[in-house]
From Swiss-Prot:
EC number: 3.6.1.1
Keyword Hydrolase attributed: yes
Encoding gene per record: ppa2
Gene3D superfamilies named in the record: Inorganic pyrophosphatase
Lineage: Bacteria, Pseudomonadati, Pseudomonadota, Gammaproteobacteria, Pseudomonadales
Subunit structure: Homohexamer.
InterPro entries reported in the protein's UniProt record: Pyrophosphatase (IPR008162), Pyrophosphatase_sf (IPR036649)
Record-given protein name: Inorganic pyrophosphatase 2
List of residues binding Mg(2+) 2: D71
Cofactor: Mg(2+)
Sorted UniProt keywords: Cytoplasm, Hydrolase, Magnesium, Metal-binding
Disulfide bonds: none
Biological source species: Pseudomonas syringae pv. tomato (strain ATCC BAA-871 / DC3000)
Length: 181
């Protein structure tokens, strides 16, 4: 099955699906889903001995500014296995730039239907400051030992900005899909 068979969500932008590629607190291995086949490949072994501080994946059937599906970090109490789809809701967005250009990461929590643990979290600022610092530190440093690769942190955006980024990425995907017919 291809991940293009999975819709972006139930009620975009507040209830979306995230395909997990890398579990939280996992070994320093960067996995990527091959979108057409649905297979999970090892993209590379991170040169820095660091692990992703949250479950990392993407929203299917989206297209972000970097030409890939929109990236998501899902904050939850457990690592989620690669290839699993989790219902998510946005609480913010992290704007950054890397060697390939602009690269936004939606910050999300599990949808209320999955867990009430995060029902009080409406914005990134409702998350622990240490967790946000860990996320920022990870992305600012995880490419540091890879020649030609770099990341520059921009700013944290609101849940409303994340929702707008999700809407835009769904629209961009649909536009590209229509143009290819």
């Amino acid at each position: 099955m291809s991940y293009t068979d999975i819709p972006a969500g139930n009620a975009i932008p507040d209830d979306f699906f995230t395909v997990i590629e890398i579990p939280a607190n996992h070994s320093p291995i960067k996995y990527e889903v091959d979108k057409p086949s649905g297979q999970i490949f090892v993209d590379r072994f991170l040169s820095t001995p660091m692990f992703y501080p949250a479950n990392y994946g993407f929203i299917p059937n989206t297209l972000s500014d970097d030409g890939d599906p929109l990236d998501v970090l899902v904050i939850c109490p457990y690592p989620v296995s690669p290839g699993v789809v989790i219902r998510s809701r946005p609480v913010g967005v992290m704007y950054m730039t890397d060697e390939a250009g602009a690269d936004a990461k939606v910050i999300a929590v599990p949808h209320e239907k999955l867990s009430s643990m995060y029902s009080n979290v409406k914005e990134c600022s409702d998350l622990p400051a240490l967790l946000l610092a860990q996320i920022q530190h990870f992305f600012e440093n995880y490419k540091a030992l890879e020649p030609g690769k770099w990341v520059k942190m921009g700013r944290w955006g609101s849940a409303d900005e994340a929702r707008e980024d999700i809407r835009k990425s769904v629209a961009a995907y649909n536009l590209k899909k229509e143009a290819s017919k």
